[in-house]
Amino acid sequence: MRRPKTGSLLLGSSTLLAVIPTPPDHSSAAVIEEIPGLIKLHRNGHVVRLPAMPEVPSTYSPEPGVVSGDVTINPSAGLWARIYVPRYPGRHPLPVLLYFHGGGFCVGSPAWRCYHNFLSRLAGTAACVVVSASYRLAPEHRLPAAYEDGVAALAWLRQQAGRAGADPGGWGWRARCDFGRVFVAGTLPRTLLL
């Protein structure tokens, strides 16, 4: 007997009762594109993002000499950044690294543990303030949305340089920054940065 390729298995107590074939789903909810283990795009436009990488709060500290916190860049677009600042006292402001996570513009977050751990260590080792900016992801937000968000993050950072008083987040990160030495890096394709 041939087994059906798709189906539903009905169990009663501990005995197999029947296998009822289920026809393939050609409705608007059918998956039309998939990055296995990461994202599914359904015909009706619904996007399912699978929990590929654990997210950690900014208070999670893999590097004891670094403090981190989240700030809002653009609330209407949902843009935010995670900022890492070395704790050691210094008389001189630190250079700033604006970092964009990888993921092909489809997946990723500054809150992913892999990026959080790496950037926390980088801030401590390189003695710099790291600003890890979020950006809107495809397919919900097609390119050039991610590019525009990168430009918005850089513009936001420039605005921070000209502001006095308490900084977003209220924990003093802005006073530690040398806004005359800002660098951009990431695990994105280099074409984003050109």
Regions inferred by a protein language model and the residue ranges of each:
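N-terminal targeting or regulatory segments adjacent to alpha/beta-hydrolase or S9 domains
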Residues: 1-62
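N-terminal cap/lid segment of alpha/beta-hydrolase-fold proteins
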Residues: 41-92
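Short, surface-exposed "cap/lid" segments of acyl-processing enzymes
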Residues: 85-122
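Catalytic nucleophile-loop/oxyanion-hole region of alpha/beta-hydrolase
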Residues: 109-118, 126, 131-179
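Short glycine-enriched nucleophile-adjacent loop
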Residues: 158, 191-194
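Conserved alpha/beta-hydrolase "nucleophile elbow" surrounding the catalytic nucleophile
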Residues: 182-191
